[in-house]
Design a protein with these regions (language model features):
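Non-catalytic C-terminal accessory modules of carbohydrate-active enzymes
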Residues: 1-145
Length: 145
């Protein structure tokens, strides 16, 4: 997957930008047509030319994995009980009932910020212990939950 490759090679800003653009395009097509499509045209805001309506297919990654991992910046490592939260959005965002392995359930919230360099205000609730690494434009902080 392109986004994963960009992230693994350190191009976090570009991965976030591409993910945000793709997510916005899928949302716009959904709003215009009232359905999710199997695939989308790469250069216009419409379904792909051989796309089936009411068929999630790969599009299902956009409102789940792409939203959580690349827009919200959540990168879980369950075996190590570690969660990296790479905060790039300025808007308030978060996830309720975020599954963390077979037994973990997290509630994650990040308050709105006025600029990327501003330290994020994070609220987390968890039913298990973990290490949370928060990354933002001007810093990094590790918390034990």
């Amino acid at each position: 997957m392109l986004l994963r490759g960009l992230t693994k090679t350190g191009f976090h800003d570009l991965a976030h930008e591409i993910a945000r653009n793709h997510h916005a395009a899928v949302v716009r097509v959904f709003e215009a047509t009232g359905t999710l499509w199997e695939n989308h045209a790469p250069d216009t805001l419409e379904p792909g030319s051989t796309s089936a309506a009411n068929f999630v297919g790969w599009t299902g990654l956009t409102p789940t994995a792409i939203l959580f991992e690349y827009l919200f910046g959540l990168r879980p490592n369950v075996p190590e009980r570690r969660l990296i939260w790479d905060v790039r959005l300025l808007e308030a965002h978060g996830v309720e009932r975020y599954p963390f392995g077979a037994e973990g359930l997290l509630e994650l919230r990040c308050a709105a910020r006025t600029q990327a360099r501003e330290k994020p205000i994070i609220t987390i609730k968890s039913n298990l212990g973990l290490r949370l690494e928060i990354i933002w434009d001007a810093g990094r902080e590790v918390l034990t939950i």
